[in-house]
Design a protein with these regions (language model features):
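Active-site phosphate-binding strand-loop segment of PLP-dependent enzymes
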Residues: 2-58, 79
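Conserved active-site segment immediately N-terminal to the catalytic lysine
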Residues: 51-53, 57, 63-92
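Conserved PLP-binding catalytic core of the aspartate aminotransferase-like
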Residues: 162-169, 173-211
């Protein structure tokens, strides 16, 4: 296992690397990796490429087939609005599906699940990746949360999220508070997440939450904000920026 700096990823892709695993948007900084380019580099070196879409599904246009990604995984409780405990998902490229064996076996992934055969025989296609009985309440919540996506243009959503995050950064820049931007300044190199470093970040975020403005803290000193145009607008950005001004940073 080799962990490298985000800016050095492409320099370390060579024929000694068998598998490349990346989060499309870094969970700390929001930095976006070029999925298509990195996947191509990986394939040229003979590596498989696995993408984690936890911080991009629901806010960025994702084109796994176009990028020729081998595998992808993600969650639905973030920007897909499935809520706590909602199901995860997995993608396997068609050229791999017949060769893949699930690491976790479950009766829902069995070829004939209701025969209750003592010998496991995997189903065909992506169905074999199912495990056991799901939480029906979580599935029901997710089903309704996903209904809205049929009528949403992801490219338009992405542009709107850039507008919101740019507005937020510009408003924070005007304030005389000790917040240091750690996300890329260029909006096309970050997801819809904006992160700052702050010495007393945990206490500061708790104070924001008390004002019903919910961001996130990650050790040792990062505070994170996500901007989904599905439920946020410009007035929300102005409100949270003004609240920053009224809160102490120490």
């Amino acid at each position: 296992l080799k962990i490298v700096k985000p800016e050095d990823i492409t320099e370390h892709i060579n024929d000694e690397v068998a598998v490349i695993m990346l989060t499309e948007a870094d969970y700390r900084t929001g930095r976006i990796y070029d999925m298509k380019n990195i996947t191509q580099l990986g394939h040229r070196s003979g590596a498989l490429v696995i993408w984690d879409l936890a911080h991009t599904a629901g806010v960025l246009p994702i084109k796994l087939s176009e990028a020729k990604a081998d595998f992808a995984v993600g969650c639905t409780y973030k920007y897909l609005n499935g809520g706590p405990g909602s199901p995860a998902f997995i993608y396997i490229a068609p050229n791999h599906i017949n060769k893949v064996e699930p690491a976790l076996f479950g009766w829902h992934g069995h070829k004939n699940p209701f025969e209750f055969n003592l010998n496991y025989l995997p189903s065909s296609g992506i169905e074999k990746m199912k495990i056991g009985s799901p939480s029906i309440i979580s599935f029901a919540s997710l089903k309704h949360a996903l209904d809205i996506w049929d009528n949403i243009d992801m490219n338009e959503l992405r542009l709107k999220s850039i507008e919101l995050s740019e507005l937020f950064i510009s408003e924070i820049d005007k304030l005389s508070i000790d917040l240091n931007l750690v996300s890329p300044r260029d909006p096309y190199f970050r997801g819809n997440q904006v992160s700052y470093s702050l010495e007393n970040g945990y206490a500061f975020m708790q104070a924001l939450i008390q004002e019903n403005l919910i961001g996130d803290f990650r050790s040792p000193n990062l505070i994170r904000f996500g901007f989904s145009p599905i439920y946020l607008d410009e007035q929300d950005i102005i409100t949270v920026s003004y609240t920053h001004l009224t809160l102490p940073t120490n």
